[in-house]
Amino acid sequence: MDFSYDRRTLELRERLEEFMDRHVYPAEPVLAAQLADPARPRWEIPPVVADLRVEARKQGLWNLFLPGEHGAGLTNLQYAPLAEITGRSPHLAPPALNCAAPDTGNMELLAEFGTAEQRERWLEPLLDARIRSAFAMTEPEVASSDAANIATRIVRDGDEYVVDGRKWYISGAMNPDCRLLIVMGKTDPAAEPHRQQSMVLVPRDAPGVTVRRGMTVFGYDDADHGGHAEIAFEGVRVPAGNLIGEEGAGFAIAQARLGPGRIHHCMRAIGIAERALELTCRRVLDRTAFGGPLADQGVVQDWIAESRVRIEQLRLLVLKTAWLMDTVGNRGAHTEIQAIKIATPRTVEWILDKAVQAHGAAGVSQDTPLAALWAFNRTIRIADGPDEVHKRSLARRELRRYR
């Protein structure tokens, strides 16, 4: 087995690490100051992100996530270590490279399933970061992890579809640059469960679309990311040409969209873990208690050793998954995709918890990134399918081998 990266990956990784050291990490306190400025428009992209985007384009670090003609043409295995690096500063690096969710998943969806007209109208400006987008699937009144529960209706009426329903935690939708909502709803409630849903493209300014409020995540409004909106759709009419794929294909398209998204989340989460471990090591070498450095305490050494082992385990599993996605496709890598989605966020949560503990009161303060990183990572155990759904599916697949 060859565990080395190819030449292109090594070159991009070196370039990206230099970009992080020279531009991203120094910009973190700038971002904090801009977000704290009461005069700044709350939901707009902070100016520092716009500045970083200019530099990222100059460096050729743009749309790295997207394979094929529309992006950098990287495989999943080539992109994985780059996504990990961006995870070390998840609030700055991914948007700086135009590699932040939910736009990444929406661009992948449009590139794979969109018509030529849909790609021209929506994909091209997204690739250029002239607009933003959101993915509207989660609903407040039902357990949205079961697609059959989705209550939003998408009804054909002549040459149009009419959308009625309510969605929430629609990431990015508070940003005024968010122009597109990809909405999941039911077109045929009588069909078999995974053929009931369809997806339509809804302009955010369409009549009947109402942003009710911004939601918080553990008290964070994630304004720099465009927040998380609760949105009502009341008699929203869109042309029939705004349907993505065919009627009844919504669930299959969602799964195709979420597969790459899950590996992107997991690689960035490993970057979060590396950042947390680095902060832990620096902290315990610098702080003294009971007559010596915290680093001399056996329990602290146990945290550090366990963190390193767990990071290496995660990375190997995620890289194997990326390789399988490239060689046998997302469907063939389904078990591994679910495995990394189960293992990575909870393991990174453990590493972050130890980092917080090592920092004491500072670990829960705004003076380190740890509290925000913990909140960000904890959501991944729910986003793109909760742990329990993935475990249930994976266990059933495992049991089928013995029946």
Can you annotate each of these PLM segments?
Residues 1-91, 99-101, 113-118, 125-130, ...:
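Alpha-helical interface subdomain recognition
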Residues 159-160, 164-212:
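A short core secondary-structure module
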Residues 149, 205-237:
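Flexible, small-/acidic-enriched active-site or ligand-binding loops
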Residues 106-113, 135-136, 190:
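Flexible, glycine-rich active-site loops centered on histidine and acidic residues
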Residues 151-153:
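Short, surface-exposed charged micro-motifs
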Residues 129-138, 183:
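A short, Trp-centered hydrophobic/proline-enriched beta-strand micro-motif
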